[in-house]
């Protein structure tokens, strides 16, 4: 009987692994096609819609955690606010050169109005105005700001001589961050025994963390070797990509840990129940912390060309 249970456990683990590989491979293929066509008008609007939708779903999932914890009543309201914030952000970042100057302020104006409106929208809420406004604001910013910064990384080189440089940087950011996730998952599953934070994220192991760091370093080294010749002038110190990739892998790990803390506080295993994925936050969590690091790096090192 014991052997039978072990067999079922292993079979279930392999089935889950197979589903993860299939789902993430399909998502990755779609993402690559979308990224590398993101400078064309039609596909750029598709990307804008998809990123705004992802942000809205992520915000809804975070708000649902708050609902489970403290009966937060505005999950859908916050998700709509996140969608509008990111849709306006996309328009101002991608098409700002052809829009009136005041358009850059619209996303932030909407955010302020949305938070104030949330206070008056639920007058009899059991959690109070301070908590209500705080959860509404944070639920939008937690997901919305990193996605907005990702759009900056992708499109801020569009008016330079090398508009595809933004796509290169976006690819580097995703590859190193999610590569660390993948290396950490597989090696942690195969060889990991010692847990890093068993009370927060039981599946995170020391072996997985080290493997993730090595994976991010390896991927950044590959990018370093394959820098296109036409981009060379933008990389006065190209070797800095290697420690940057490591930093993105490490911050991505802590982004994952932060989301796990939120889930444990709400007594949830996954942020949602998408097959083989968990939820939008479970997919984006590592990028939510690594994206601001990549943005700051570009803002400092590419200040002449990068329109942050």
From Swiss-Prot:
It is an enzyme of class 2 (transferase). Pathway: Phospholipid metabolism; CDP-diacylglycerol biosynthesis; CDP-diacylglycerol from sn-glycerol 3-phosphate: step 3/3. Pfam families: CTP_transf_1. One of its GO terms (cellular component) is plasma membrane. It is found in: Cell membrane. The chain crosses the membrane at residues 30-50, 73-93, 100-120, 127-147, 167-187, 205-225, 235-255, 280-300. It is a multi-pass membrane protein. GO terms for molecular function: phosphatidate cytidylyltransferase activity. The keyword DNA damage does not apply. It catalyses: a 1,2-diacyl-sn-glycero-3-phosphate + CTP + H(+) = a CDP-1,2-diacyl-sn-glycerol + diphosphate. Keywords: Cell membrane, Lipid biosynthesis, Lipid metabolism, Membrane, Nucleotidyltransferase, Phospholipid biosynthesis, Phospholipid metabolism, Transferase, Transmembrane, Transmembrane helix. GO terms for biological process: CDP-diacylglycerol biosynthetic process. The keyword Transferase applies. Its EC number is 2.7.7.41. It comes from the Bacteria. Its main location: membrane. Belongs to the CDS family. This is Phosphatidate cytidylyltransferase. It comes from Chlamydia pneumoniae. The gene is cdsA.
